[in-house]
Regions:
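Long, acidic/polar, low-complexity amphipathic helices and coiled-coil-like
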Residues: 1-42, 49
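Short, conserved, GDST-rich strand-edge loop motifs in beta-rich repeat architectures
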Residues: 1-7, 57-73, 113-130, 177-179
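Beta-propeller blade signature
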Residues: 2-21, 70-84, 128-141, 185-192
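Beta-propeller fold detector
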Residues: 21-32, 81, 85-95, 143-152, ...
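Repeated scaffold domains used in trafficking and secretory/extracellular systems
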Residues: 33-47, 94-108, 155-165, 203-216
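Long non-transmembrane domains of secretory-pathway and surface proteins
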Residues: 43-57, 61-79, 84-92, 98-102, ...
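Intrinsically disordered, low-complexity segments enriched in Gly and acidic/Ser/Thr residues
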Residues: 87-181
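Blade-level signature of beta-propeller repeat domains, shared across WD40, Kelch, NHL, RCC1
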Residues: 178, 194-222
Length: 222
C-alpha cells in the first residue's frame, strides 16, 4: 500500500534572512522528497557545501517495486553558488539502488554517503535490519566506491535514524553496528585512503550518533 506521505515533487523556498522575505519558491519534480527526518540537520547530515560554495541536497524517490514508505532510492541535487534553483543538468548518485541516509562532505570534491540497501548487504529486507553501508562519492565523476578495511567492506550496520560519519582534521570517522561482532569505529585517512580500526565497544550496546567535542578548525578571516 502506498504511503499517504508520498508525493511526486517538493518545493524549496529561498528566504532572505535579514527580513524573512521570500525570494522565490521553486518546485522540484525529478525526485520525490528531500532525505529529511524529524530532527533534520540537528541529528543527521542531509546537506553540505563543496569547496566552491555549491549546496548539495540528499533526496529520495519511491522505488517502483516499493511495498512501504521506507523503500526508496536516493540522489544528490545541487544548487550552484549564487543561484536560486536546482541545477537541472546535475543529478548526483545516479544509481538504480541505494537510499541516502546521510551525506557528509569530506573535501577534495568528494562526499561520504551512508546508504540503505538490503540487496547490497544481503539483509533480509528493509526496516530494522543490517542493511546499511558506507561509500565515497566523487562529485565530479559520480563514481561510488565502498569503504573497505583490510580488503573487505566495513561491517554492514543497523540504524537509519543516526549519524555514523564525522569528518575532522583530515580524517573520516565511521561508526558501525554489526550483526555478529562488537560495534566499532573505523578511521579513514583522506590524504592516503588508508583505513585503520579504532575502538570497539561492548556487544549489546550500539552507536546512534558521533559528535565532535570541539568546533571544527576554520581558517582565519583577514
Amino acid at each position: 500500500k502506498k504511503s499517504k506521505f508520498w508525493s511526486n515533487d517538493f518545493n524549496v523556498i529561498f528566504i532572505k534572512a535579514s527580513d524573512m522575505s521570500v525570494k522565490c519558491d521553486v518546485k522540484e519534480t525529478r525526485v520525490h522528497t528531500m532525505a529529511g527526518t524529524a530532527y533534520g540537520e540537528l541529528l543527521q547530515d542531509k546537506t553540505f557545501w563543496d569547496d566552491k560554495g555549491n549546496l548539495y541536497v540528499a533526496c529520495n524517490t519511491e522505488r517502483t517495486d516499493a511495498q512501504s514508505y521506507t523503500e526508496q532510492v536516493g540522489n544528490l541535487l545541487r544548487i550552484n553558488k549564487g543561484e536560486f534553483q536546482f541545477d537541472q543538468n546535475y543529478m548526483g548518485h545516479n544509481y538504480s539502488a541505494g537510499k541516502l541516509i546521510t551525506s557528509t562532505y569530506m573535501g577534495n570534491n568528494k562526499a561520504v554517503l551512508y546508504i540503505q540497501d538490503p540487496v547490497h548487504t544481503g539483509a533480509a529486507g528493509w526496516g530494522n535490519n543490517y542493511n546499511c553501508w558506507f561509500a565515497i562519492l566523487d562529485l565530479a565523476t559520480d563514481q561510488r566506491t565502498e569503504v573497505v578495511y583490510n580488503g573487505t567492506h566495513l561491517p554492514y550496520s543497523l540504524g537509519t535514524f543516526a549519524q555514523f560519519a564525522v569528518v575532522r582534521d583530515g580524517k573520516v570517522y565511521f561508526a558501525t553496528n554489526p550483526e555478529k561482532e562488537a560495534p566499532g569505529i573505523y578511521i579513514y585517512d583522506i590524504a592516503t585512503g588508508n583505513v585503520t580500526k579504532g575502538l570497539s565497544i561492548q556487544e549489546g550496546y550500539s552507536f546512534r550518533r558521533l559528535v565532535p567535542m570541539e568546533r571544527e578548525k576554520l581558517p582565519a578571516v583577514l
